[in-house]
Amino acid sequence: LASFSNPVFFKTQALRFSTHGIPRFISCARIENGYLALPRGCLDDAIALLQEQNISPLFDDKRETGKPLLKLTPEFTLRKNQRDAVATITKHDFGILHAPTAFGKTVTAIGMIVKRKVNTLILVHSRQLLEQWQERLRTFLPEVTIGSIGGGKRKPIGIIDIATYQSLVNKKDNSITPLIQDYGHIIVDECHHLSAPRFEMVLNEVRAKYVLGLTATPERQDGHQKIIFMAAGPIRYKVKQSPDEQFTQTVMIHQLYDIPPAELIKTDERPKISDAYRWLVNNEQRTSKIVSDAYECVQNGGHPLVLTERREHAESIHSRLTEMGISTVVLKGAMKAAERKNADNHLQSAQVVVATGKYVGEGFDLPRLDTLFLAMPIAWKGTLAQYAGRIHRESEGKTQVTIHDYVDCALPILQRMFKKREKSYKAMGYALEYFEGNSDKQPSLKLENVPSSNTKQK
C-alpha cells in the first residue's frame, strides 16, 4: 500500500550506471510503538483491502480538530469554478486541488479556510511564497492577524500561520517542532515538493484533521509523485488543462542555426547539457536577438518576462536592455536582502522583467505580463507549464499571451528538448508559428516539425 518501485533506480540501471545508494523500492510506511503507520493517503486503499477480507475496521480518531475560527469576514467572492472546487473538496478531510496556474488556487484555499473555520497552518517551500501568502491573506482576510515562521523570523499566532517547512525542522537532530501538531487544518502550497525527504518528515508529524495540497503539476520528473499522494491524499478536484478561453495563445518559434563549437558536436559522445548552456550563454548573436525581440515587444506595448536558467545570462540580458533605455528589473537566486527589496520596489514600474526560472517559476504573481521569452531551453512539461503560467494571470485589457521559443537546430540534444516542448505547447492549446532565425549560416540540421492544423509556417 505504501511502497512503490523507484523509477530513478531502474532508469539508472538501464543506463548501466552505478545504482549504489539508490533504493530499488521506496516505502512511506514505518513501524512506530508496535503499530504499522501508513500515510493518510493510503486510508481508502487500506479500508478497501480489509473489506475485501470481510474485516470491519474500528476507528480511534486521534486527529487534531483545531481551534475554531468564528469571526472570519472574507473580502472576496469566489468564481463559480472556485466555488465548485471548495464544495467538492469539503466532502473529504484530505486531498489535493490540481488546477493550472491562474485558476486562483490561493484564493480558493483561503475559501477553504473560511469554510473549515479552524486554525490553519500554510506550508510553503520558499520565503518568496511565504511573503506572497502574507500579502494575499492581508488583502482577503484583513481582520485576521497573520503569523509566520521562516525567513529568520518566528512569530506564530496560532490562528492562521504561514511557515516554510525548512524552518520547522531542527537542523541538529532533524526533529520537528511540536507546534505543527496544534493546527486543525494544514494547507501545503506547491505540494509537488512533498517528495523532498524533510518536507515529507514534516507532514508525517501533522495531526490535523484537514489537509489540503495545492499544485498545478502533480507529476514529477523523477517519478516520485506517489509520495505526494500518500502524504496529502488523492486528487479531489482537477481543473482540466483546456485551451484558455480568455486569451489568444501563440508560440513564436525562432529556428536558429549558429554552429556550436567542435566539442559539442562530436559524434562519439553526447554533450552535457551544462556545456550546451554555457555555449548559449556565450553566444553573442543569439543573446542579441533575444534582447532585440524583447525591445520590439516593449515598443509594441507588450509586457515581457525573459526567463533563463543561468544568472550570468540574466545579468547580460538585463545590462543590454538597460543600455537601450529600457527599464528592467532582474530577479535571480543568491540576491542579498537589499537587492531583493530594491527589485521588488521597481517590479511594478519595470518595462521588462528578467529572471531565472527557479526564482519565478512558482508562485510569482505579476498579472500584467503577457509575453514570455524562453531564453534557455527546457524539456520537462511540468516546468514549461509553470513558466507559461506566469503570463496567464488575469489582467484588465489582456487578451493575448505569447511565448517566444528559441530553438538551436544545430545541436541534436537541444532539438530533442524542443520536441518535448512542442508537444507540451499543443497540449496547453497554443498555436505554433515557425520563423527562420537571423543567422546567415546554412542549417546543419533542419528542425523536424510537422505543422498541425493550428500551426503556421512563416
Mark where each language-model region is.
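Conserved helix/coil segment N-terminal to the catalytic DExD/H
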Residues: 151-185, 196-201, 359
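Conserved nucleic-acid-binding Ia/Ib motif block in the N-terminal RecA-like helicase ATPase lobe
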Residues: 118-170, 328
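Post-DEXD/H (motif II) to motif III coupling segment of the RecA-like Helicase ATP-binding lobe
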Residues: 184-185, 192-253, 425
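Walker A/P-loop
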Residues: 91-113
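Conserved pre-motif I regulatory segment
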Residues: 27-31, 49-52, 57-98
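Conserved helicase ATPase core of P-loop NTP-dependent helicases/translocases
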Residues: 131, 146-149, 154-156, 305, ...
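Conserved RecA-like P-loop NTPase helicase motor core
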Residues: 332-427, 431
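Conserved interdomain hinge at the start of the Helicase C-terminal
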Residues: 268-309, 315-320
